[in-house]
Amino acid sequence: MWVARDAKVYPTAYLGAPCIIGHKTEVRPGAFIRGNALVGDNCVVGNSTELKNVILFDNVQVPHYNYVGDSILGYKSHMGAGSITSNVKSDKLPVVIHNEGEEIETGRKKVGAMLGDYVEVGCNSVLNPGTVIGRDASVYPTSCVRGVVPERCKGNIAVKK
């Protein structure tokens, strides 16, 4: 485990190994980092947020009540309160990424979401297993997203910015 000297980790946060916490990152009270986590510089891992098998690029914010598992969050991406990355299908079969009629077999039972840089996920949204969201896209609050969301889209694949 490695935590940058200028990172702030509150006493009630849990850090499991292996884990790297970058410079000026804040791990707030009640955060639960289960391990296999690479958290970049200037990130916020907030109250009651759980991370597992993740890469958070610099300036990512998962500030309140988020679950991020088996996922990659790009530079300056933000997940609103209560939004989660679901990483296991309800039928427990391997995750397939759906992209405009193409099905990409992952061969893995646990795959969360992959967010490009500058992605905004609205409050209480669910990103289903294998969701890919392109750079500078926005997901509306309370959305349930599946498949590939192109870059610079708003909503649930619907409206271009």
Protein language model regions, located:
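ABC ATPase A-loop
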Residues: 2, 20, 38, 114, ...
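Active-site-adjacent structural elements in folded domains
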Residues: 25-29, 40-46, 106
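Glycine-rich hexapeptide-repeat left-handed beta-helix
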Residues: 47-48, 53-161
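The repeat-register position in solenoid repeat domains
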Residues: 22-23, 40-41, 52, 69
